[in-house]
Amino acid sequence: MNERELAAWRARHIGLVYQFYNLLPVLTAFENVELPLLLTHLSKAERKTHVESALKAVDLADRMEHYPRQLSGGQEQRVAIARAIVTDPTILIADEPTGDLDAKSAEEILLLLTQLNRQYHKTIVMVTHDPRSERFVDTVYRLDKGVFIGSTTGGMSATPLQPSE
C-alpha cells in the first residue's frame, strides 16, 4: 500500500479515542461527531443519520445541540467516542479513555466500550495504566518499559503489575 491508500484504509477501519476529548469548543456535539464524515462523499442527510445513530449509541441523543462547555467530562468523552465510531470503523483504539475522569464516569465509559464491543462487534484496543479496567476486557497484554512481559485473561488479575526497578 502506498501512503495515500494506507491513510484511506486507516480512515475507514480505525477510530481513535484520546484521554483528552479533543472536541472543538465552538462546535456542538452533533458538529464535533460529524467532522470525520465531512471527508466522505456522504450527503448531508446521510451524515445526519450517521451522527444521530452514533450519538444514540453513546446515549447522548438528547445532547446533540450542546457545546462541550455544557457537558460533563463523561459526556464529553462519550461525544469523542461517538466521533470515533461515526464512520463505523472495525477497530477502535482508546488511549487512556478514562484517565481524565472521576471513578463513576470512568466506569460508565468502560461499560460503554464493552457494549460497543459486544453489540457492534468492534475490536477495541485500549491503552491504560488503570488496573481496574481489567474486569471490562477479554485479554490484558502487559508491557514494562515498552517490552511485552505477558498476557492474562481480563478480570482474572486484580493485582496491578509492579514496574521493574
Q: Could you tell me what each predicted segment is?
A:
Residues 1-143:
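ABC family nucleotide-binding domain
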Residues 145-151, 156:
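Conserved switch/coupling elements of ABC/ABC-like ATPase nucleotide-binding domains
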Residues 162-164:
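Long, low-complexity, intrinsically disordered segments
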